């Protein structure tokens, strides 16, 4: 479902009050926060449940959510099974 227009966009309070002058690295666990123009050309470190992953903010990512750029599940790689030769 789409968020109601009258509510506005959601940005976490920890991101709204962040002062990049005193601390240049932005660290958050809020994957549901919307990327706003204030963060353009900055790197935000988002927690994926195991570690913090850096997300570089560009113009294409404005208006999208931080969680879209951080995978929370490991991509499974299957190994090819070895075929046994019969003699």
UniProtKB/Swiss-Prot annotation:
Keywords: Mitochondrion, Ribonucleoprotein, Ribosomal protein. It is found in: Mitochondrion. GO terms for molecular function: RNA binding; structural constituent of ribosome. One of its GO terms (biological process) is translation. Its main location: mitochondrion. Signal peptide: none annotated. One of its GO terms (cellular component) is ribosome. Belongs to the universal ribosomal protein uS19 family. This is Small ribosomal subunit protein uS19m. It comes from Dictyostelium citrinum (Slime mold). The gene is mrps19.
């Amino acid at each position: 479902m789409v968020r109601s227009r009258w509510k506005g966009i959601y940005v976490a309070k920890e991101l709204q009050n962040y002062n990049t002058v005193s601390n240049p690295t932005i660290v958050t666990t809020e994957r549901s926060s919307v990327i706003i123009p204030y963060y353009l050309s900055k790197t935000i470190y988002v927690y994926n449940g195991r570690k913090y992953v850096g997300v570089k903010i560009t113009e294409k990512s404005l208006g999208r959510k931080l969680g879209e750029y951080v995978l929370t599940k490991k991509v499974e790689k299957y190994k090819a099974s070895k075929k046994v030769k019969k003699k």
